A protein has these predicted regions:
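Intrinsic-disorder/low-complexity loop/linker signature
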Residues: 52-54, 74, 139-144, 181-182, ...
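Short hydrophobic/aromatic-rich beta-strand segments that constitute the beta-sheet cores
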Residues: 42, 77-80, 170-172
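Edge beta-strand at a domain terminus
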Residues: 18-23, 150-159, 163-208
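Predominantly extracellular/secreted and cell-surface proteins with exposed
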Residues: 72-160
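Tryptophan-anchored aromatic micro-motifs
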Residues: 32-54
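Polybasic, proline/glycine-rich intrinsically disordered low-complexity segments
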Residues: 66-67
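Bacterial Sec-dependent N-terminal signal peptides
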Residues: 1-36, 206-208
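Acidic, glycine-anchored loop motifs typical of Ca2+
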Residues: 53-63
Length: 208
């Protein structure tokens, strides 16, 4: 689903960007070091949320921040990810109730800089690593191992400006929920019941 297509993202179908055209390891690290030099403290995480009072605004947000590893190891850290916000998109009521009680999480994201990057903007694909939860729920009050898997945007690259003022943003989605080693069919987007993913956008917070 293209939830935030109005943002200034670059299409993944950029002309001339083929699977054979990739950055060398040295080029990749050079871009990553340039990205790490920036400060990304005033960020926000936007996510899909049902809003019956305004059908044109099916989005909510939480403040966040980000740090990018200076070691060129393709990792960035996202703070205050709203795990509990996923509850309304889960069809299993017991699991949803357990998810709703979860605190915000600090999560690692893996990213890879794309070859259409320039000296001013690094374009990249990014995705959070899986979130592992140990939850107790259900009528039998049993403990369950729950894993949340994400997928990067299939339509738009993320971006990071390499000059001040720094701008960074990328899209991703909750893609699968596994419980006790089994893939489930529990994702049911509350804003569109036909959608089996939940969209997120991580970007700079807009000034009011």
């Amino acid at each position: 689903a293209v939830l935030f297509a109005a943002m200034s993202f670059t299409s993944c179908n950029t002309d001339g960007d083929s699977g054979m055209n990739i950055l060398t390891l040295e080029q990749q690290k050079s871009f990553q070091h340039a990205m790490a030099a920036g400060s990304y403290n005033n960020m926000t995480i936007l996510y899909e949320k049902k809003n019956d009072a305004n059908v044109k605004n099916q989005v909510d947000s939480v403040p966040s921040s980000c740090s990018i590893s200076m070691y060129g190891d393709s990792t960035m850290t996202m703070y205050k990810f709203p795990v509990a916000a996923l509850a309304e998109h889960i069809s299993n009521k017991d699991l949803a109730a357990a998810i709703a009680k979860e605190d915000q999480r600090t999560i690692k994201c893996k990213y890879n800089v794309m070859p259409n990057s320039t000296s001013e903007v690094a374009y990249f694909i990014a995705c959070p690593e899986a979130i592992n939860l140990n939850l107790t729920y259900g009528t039998d009050n049993k403990s369950h191992k729950v894993v949340l898997y994400f997928i990067p945007s299939q339509m738009y690259y993320g971006y990071c400006s390499l000059k001040e003022p720094r701008q960074l943003g990328f899209q991703f989605a909750l893609y699968q929920i596994w419980v006790d080693g089994y893939q489930t069919n529990f994702i049911q987007n509350s804003t569109n019941s036909a959608n089996t993913t939940v969209g997120f956008l991580f970007r700079n917070a807009w000034k009011k």
